[in-house]
Amino acid sequence: MDKALVSPIEDAFARYSTLTVEEIEDSIRPTVNRVIDGLETGAFRVAEPDNHGGWKVNEWLKKAVLLYFRVHDTMIVDAQPAPFWDKIESRFSGYDAAKFRAAGVRVVPGAIARRGSYFGKDVVLMPSFTNIGAYVGEGTMIDTWATVGSCAQLGAHCHLSGGAAIGGVLEPLQASPAIIEDHCFIGARSEIVEGVIVGHHSVISMGVFISQSTRIYNRATGEISYGYVPPYSVVVSGQLPAKDGTHSLYCAVIVKQVDEKTRAKTSINELLRGFAD
């Protein structure tokens, strides 16, 4: 954490609506831009492992992202086939072949990434959307029409399938971003939002929706939890009966948990078969 940046960001955010044009021009905008540059390079992360098996959210970085909207004017963003009218530049604006090679990221036509997002080596961006402050680890694929929300954290060697979404923190304002740890598979049209954490090497099947209020039922133990999918889980959508027995409500079901050896030897499709047995 760069203490020389934290204090100015905290002070400016406390006066968000009363900042003067002069101080924005003289100090706040340059400071915010330095923070956004750090998010792009991976020097800063909105959320990071705490070395105790959990995650720590760096609130000052969220505030810097929000301040970016305050200290920048709406502008023309060049694009094809038509320009955009936005406050945030394209992540790869001005890139040439040399810069793309150095970044090691493959960006397919139709992919949109905003400034302030980080991409590790060997990331593949299909036509998708990645918002400001997001972190995408090395070797991860963001598939067609997938969304990585503002400040969302997506680990290394993950696959975010077509139409899937990882929720951000800015709209609506959330305390924590959604976090997908390393080596996870998120199935098509699934959504992980509201600061939910998916543990490493987990498989989320197609069409699974998990928020902080979603019941996560472990079929093996009968336990119900919220907001956290343990590592090596295989999760599908399901239902649990209401207490009065008149109806059922949606839930996510952990149908099995596999060890690392099994996960390495088994394809994703095989892991998702037979869960109705």
Curated annotation (Swiss-Prot):
SUPFAM superfamilies xrefs: Trimeric LpxA-like enzymes (SSF51161)
Which top-level group of life is the source organism from? Bacteria
InterPro entries from the xrefs? DapD_Trfase_Hexpep_rpt_fam, Hexapep, THP_succinylTrfase_dom1, THP_succinylTrfase_N_sf, Trimer_LpxA-like_sf
Subcellular localization, as worded in the UniProt entry: Cytoplasm
Q: Any idea which GO molecular function terms this record carries?
A: 2,3,4,5-tetrahydropyridine-2,6-dicarboxylate N-succinyltransferase activity; nucleotidyltransferase activity
Its main localization is: cytoplasm
Any S-S bridges, and between which cysteines? none
One GO cellular component this record assigns the protein to is: cytoplasm
> What is the E.C. number?
2.3.1.117
Q: Which UniProt keywords apply?
A: Acyltransferase, Amino-acid biosynthesis, Cytoplasm, Diaminopimelate biosynthesis, Lysine biosynthesis, Repeat, Transferase
Residues engaged in binding substrate: R106, D143
**Does Methyltransferase appear among the keywords?**
no
**Pathway involvement of the protein, from the record:** Amino-acid biosynthesis; L-lysine biosynthesis via DAP pathway; LL-2,6-diaminopimelate from (S)-tetrahydrodipicolinate (succinylase route): step 1/3
Looking up NCBIfam families in the UniProt record yields: dapD, PRK11830.1
How does it associate, per the subunit comment? Homotrimer.
Spell out the PANTHER family in the cross-references: 2,3,4,5-TETRAHYDROPYRIDINE-2,6-DICARBOXYLATE N-SUCCINYLTRANSFERASE, MOLYBDENUM COFACTOR GUANYLYLTRANSFERASE
The name on file for this protein is 2,3,4,5-tetrahydropyridine-2,6-dicarboxylate N-succinyltransferase
